[in-house]
Amino acid sequence: MFLLHEYDIFWAFLIISSIIPILAFLISGVLTPIREGSEKLSSYESGIEPMGNAWLQFRIRYYMFALVFVVFDVETVFLYPWAMSFDVLGISVFIEAFIFVLIPIVGLVYAWRKGALEWS
C-alpha cells in the first residue's frame, strides 16, 4: 500500500500538465471578443493579401514518400540505443531487433510491388 506514494509526483504532474492547457483554452475563449466581418473570413498568408487561388493540391506521392521516410526514421531512432548496447543484451534482443527491422522492410517491399512508390 505504501508503494503507491512513489507515484504521487507523477500523478500531480500529470494533473497539473492537463489542467494548464485546458485552463488556457477556457480563459482565451472567455476573454476573446467575438467579431464577425470580412477580415475574419479572408485567407491569411504571412500578413499579405493572397494572390490567386489560396487552395493548392499536393500529389499523394509526396505523402507516400514522407510516410516511408518517417517510418524508417523512427525505426532508426529506436535502433540506435540498441546498437550502442548490443554487446550487453545478447542474442534474444538481436532476434527481436531483426524482427523489428523486418516488419517495415516487408511493408516497403509490398508497397514497392504494388506500385505505390512509382513516381509516374
UniProtKB/Swiss-Prot annotation:
Protein name per the record: NAD(P)H-quinone oxidoreductase subunit 3, chloroplastic
Cellular component annotations (GO), alphabetically ordered: chloroplast thylakoid membrane; NADH dehydrogenase complex
Regions that span the bilayer: 9-29, 64-84, 88-108
Gene3D superfamilies: NADH:ubiquinone/plastoquinone oxidoreductase, chain 3 (1.20.58.1610)
Subunit note: NDH is composed of at least 16 different subunits, 5 of which are encoded in the nucleus.
Annotated organism of origin: Dioscorea elephantipes (Elephant's foot yam)
Localization of this protein: Plastid, Chloroplast thylakoid membrane
Keywords, comma-separated and alphabetical: Chloroplast, Membrane, NAD, NADP, Plastid, Plastoquinone, Quinone, Thylakoid, Translocase, Transmembrane, Transmembrane helix, Transport
GO biological process, alphabetically ordered: photosynthesis, light reaction
Gene name linked to the record: ndhC
Keyword Nucleus: no
Topological type in the membrane: Multi-pass membrane protein
Record-linked InterPro entries: NAD(P)H_OxRDtase_bac/plastid (IPR023043), NADH_UbQ/plastoQ_OxRdtase_su3 (IPR000440), NDAH_ubi_oxred_su3_sf (IPR038430)
Catalytically driven reaction(s): a plastoquinone + NADH + (n+1) H(+)(in) = a plastoquinol + NAD(+) + n H(+)(out); a plastoquinone + NADPH + (n+1) H(+)(in) = a plastoquinol + NADP(+) + n H(+)(out)
Free-text function comment from the UniProt entry: NDH shuttles electrons from NAD(P)H:plastoquinone, via FMN and iron-sulfur (Fe-S) centers, to quinones in the photosynthetic chain and possibly in a chloroplast respiratory chain. The immediate electron acceptor for the enzyme in this species is believed to be plastoquinone. Couples the redox reaction to proton translocation, and thus conserves the redox energy in a proton gradient.
Biological classification of the source: Eukaryota, Viridiplantae, Streptophyta, Embryophyta, Tracheophyta
Enzyme class, UniProt record, top EC level: translocase
Family: Belongs to the complex I subunit 3 family.
Domain of life according to the entry: Eukaryota
EC number(s) given by UniProt: 7.1.1.-
Molecular function GO labels: NADH dehydrogenase (ubiquinone) activity; quinone binding
